[in-house]
Amino acid sequence: MSETLRIEIDVDRALAILRELSPASMQAAWRRTLRKTHVWIKGQVAKAVSKETKIPQKVLRSRVYFFLKSYDSGKVWLGLNAVEAERLGDPRQTKTGVTAGRFRFQSAWLMKRIAPNGPVYRRAGKARLPYERVKYDWADAGEAAFRNIAELAEQRLLTILEQEVNYEIQKAIGNAK
């Protein structure tokens, strides 16, 4: 499932405030704003998806990336590929399969001799071979959470920008800490 989600945020109102500062101050405030907004989006997406799917936030945060394309634009990327079962928690062999974290995978097994905490496998057909690695698909829940957070991102961006502009103004008049 590879779909591009494009979010347009109108920042003209915010940039009007920044035009009152020097170009270097304006650029510094905007870059900090983009970076802090990315950190906020990363945390919120991880929190929302983790709450819905029970996948650990640590695993989800490693799948959110931010690219600063130019001085005035950035791109947030969320990897929606299925998560390997062994990344969901410490895999344990049970009578009926494997348990990893809060998830149970029926008819799955670990290769204890090769890698005790390694990949979890399941037969791909009725025969002995082939077998495949077990993965947990979370794309639908992840995309829905990302869309919800994207709707809130513009307001958060403006809030952070206001704080950063205030910091630059305080720095210019000598009151910054």
Name every feature range the model reports, one short phrase each.
Residues M1-K177:
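Short, Lys/Arg-rich flexible segments
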